[in-house]
Amino acid sequence: MALPVYYDKDIDLGVIQSLQVGIIGYGAQGEAQALNLRDSKVKVRIGLYQGSLSVSKAKKEGFEVLGVKELVQQSDVIMALLPDELHKEVLEKEVIPFLKEGQIVGFAHGFSVHFNQVVLPKGVGAILVAPKGPGSALREEYLKNRGLYHLIAIEQESSKNNAKAVALSYAKAMGGGRMGVLKTSFKEECESDLFGEQAVLCGGLEAIVRMGFETLIKAGYPEELAYFECVHEVKLVADLLHYKGVEGLRKHISNTAEFGAIKAREPMGNLLEKRMQKILKKIQNGSFAKDFLLEKSLNYPRLNTERKALKETKIEQIGEILRAPFNHKK
């Protein structure tokens, strides 16, 4: 691997155990991280605004809940586990004014720091600890004595505590050292994460799935078959990719499917490469971040319109029917 990788044997858990951790936010990531840290004998408190619906949940799970200002004043390490677009508003009002030299502020994604939404005072550390998976998987893997890969990065050093040692120790407390903790930068994590979401995992995959479905429908094929071939079976392929890689996927499909994939890749590849380069450039030059923050300032008009329209599409209507047996089993 090109990136440095650290495992449990390389990391001192005592570093984070000696510090008071405060987590701002108690969504999927906040809850999972808090529970994992506590099970790793780390002192954890939760910071929430007054009236938050998460207060009762956090208290029910045995955590002390403070206001954000109070949490900052009583913590050595403060983790900002809030949506990216809220970092600037919350941190500028309730975190930064109350920070002292030597404290460390942590993030699970590099967006707000990399795009200068958040600038921390000199002497305050800025670290990234990013589990490579959702909160549910982070908790489930920890309880199975396994873990998720974690990324760490250091943007700014603390005048008191070694930021790298703290980031590594925090990742170990969440189970990251069981799988591997990779050291990167805020820039690399942020830009690659956004690109993966837009070009492949969310934007790219959704576009291919929907276009494939519509192509079959317009050609007169039944909606059920179009859904099975273009949506339902994505999980089968994704699981093979996840566990066995591209070569392993090839070994588990028919010769017909493999030859067809190679033939289809040739015309699609050139077009996709050019489009992906444009997507990456807009991420790198800050255009996407600017557009997203403008969308937030206008109260998400495009997101709301798209979400409403999606419910009315054929792919969702037939999908809801075909997914019903699976959801019923859960």
UniProtKB/Swiss-Prot annotation:
GO biological process, one term: isoleucine biosynthetic process
Keywords, ordered alphabetically: Amino-acid biosynthesis, Branched-chain amino acid biosynthesis, Magnesium, Metal-binding, NADP, Oxidoreductase
Binding annotation for substrate: 254
SUPFAM superfamilies: 6-phosphogluconate dehydrogenase C-terminal domain-like (SSF48179), NAD(P)-binding Rossmann-fold domains (SSF51735)
Enzyme class: oxidoreductase
EC number(s) stated in the UniProt entry for this protein: 1.1.1.86
Residue sites binding NADP(+) per the record: 26-29, 52, 54, 135
Protein's UniProt keywords contain Transcription regulation: no
Required cofactor(s): Mg(2+)
Record's keyword annotation contains Manganese: no
Pathway entry: Amino-acid biosynthesis; L-isoleucine biosynthesis; L-isoleucine from 2-oxobutanoate: step 2/4; Amino-acid biosynthesis; L-valine biosynthesis; L-valine from pyruvate: step 2/4
Source taxon at top rank: Bacteria
Residues annotated as binding Mg(2+) 2: 193, 229, 233
Recorded family membership: Belongs to the ketol-acid reductoisomerase family.
Name of the molecule in the record: Ketol-acid reductoisomerase (NADP(+))
